[in-house]
Amino acid sequence: MKNIFIVGGAGYVGSVLIPKLLQRNYKVTCFDLMIYGENLLKKHENLKIIKGDMRDQNLLKNIIKDFDSVIHLACISNDPSFELNPDLGKSINFDAFEPLVKICENSSINQFIYASSSSVYGIKNEQNVNEKMSLEPLTDYSKFKVKCEEVLQKYNSKNFTTTIIRPATVCGYSPRQRLDVVVNILTNLAYH
């Protein structure tokens, strides 16, 4: 059974992803600050939840053992929140990233998946954006996503495969619902 460690697993994306992984018989450890509550994920025999801060390198060194893969979802996830406290945003979205990657590389982990953002492309005139296009981030949030991608690419090797995904704005229902996304706001208004 594949054993996955998810950083930021109790957030908007993670709280949807984890049940899907459990349905597919993965063993999952969710590592999260739990600032939105500790009851977002239903108990499951293959789910372990650890409350913690990804900036705590000593804690991470002690718990990142015997995992096959890491999925990194943790971040201050929108520009207005990031701008409220830029130092906090930088400490979570960038400063803690490379130490985490190093810890993972030095453990048994052989795959690291990073959730970046399509915002790294900036504004393009082309109708279809592809990953060969230049990165032109416009905000601190997207600039730090680019920097993390650059860091992660340095660590890619035969024994430590790194994958970067660049989703567009994610919307839809989640146990940790986001109401800073226009589609979610409109859906919520229509439903209620």
Residue ranges of model-derived segments:
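Conserved Rossmann-fold NAD(P)-dependent oxidoreductase catalytic core, especially the SDR/UDP-sugar
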Residues: 72, 98-139
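NAD(P)H-binding glycine-rich loop region in Rossmannoid oxidoreductase-like domains
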Residues: 54-92
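Conserved active-site helix of classical SDR/Rossmann-fold NAD(P)-dependent CH-OH oxidoreductases
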Residues: 19, 97-98, 142, 146-153
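SDR active-site strand-loop-helix element
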Residues: 7, 31, 70-73, 112-117, ...
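N-terminal Rossmann/SDR dinucleotide-binding element
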Residues: 1-69
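Glycine-rich NAD(P)-binding loop of the Rossmann-fold in SDR/ketoreductase-type enzymes
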Residues: 55, 88-99, 135, 139, ...
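Conserved catalytic-core motifs of eukaryotic protein kinase domains, centered on the activation segment
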Residues: 40-42, 80-87, 123-127, 175-176
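NAD(P)-dependent short-chain dehydrogenase/reductase
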Residues: 150-192
